[in-house]
Amino acid sequence: MARTASTSKTKRAGSAAEPLLIDLALQGGGSHGAFSWGVLDRLLEEDWLLIEGISGTSAGAMNAAVLASGFASGGAPAAREALATFWRKVSDGARFSPFQRSPLDVLMGRWSLDNSPMFLAVDMMSRIFSPYDLNPMGTNPLTAILSEVVDFERVSNGPIKLFVTATNVHTGRGRVFRNPELTI
């Protein structure tokens, strides 16, 4: 898809006729990822901004891949819809999480999981065992969601350059993956 930007009604006074090309860096962390979705949604509303490249890690990498896939299929509106679909599916999946507030927490208005028996048990186990020991089947609910929402062929050939950083847990060295190298 050709990357063009039309003049927006919200275009800032005195800005050039050409769109402003921007690059984004998106950090990891589930709540940061959800927050970033809102920021990305707002940026994608602006015709005078054009995202040229995105670097990301963890939740930031997922946002980057979802945005790039959507953008490659239908521009900014499709990217916004892809991000909304992704985060809606993540939210729907969280309904079945064992990490829920107890009825007493709900009654008392406490939002923290600090007293959740399941959270405390998993937290203790994660300090003793590797996540791979606790998940021998290698299940990850995000895999199915990403497979459904992201078209990696479109990402590979898309107009937005992606740079996803991952760390090798054995060596501690980082590696940057680019568009054609990205998979789940």
List each language-model region with its residue ranges.
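Small-residue-rich anion-binding loops in enzyme active sites
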Residues: 1-25, 160-161, 165-170, 176-180
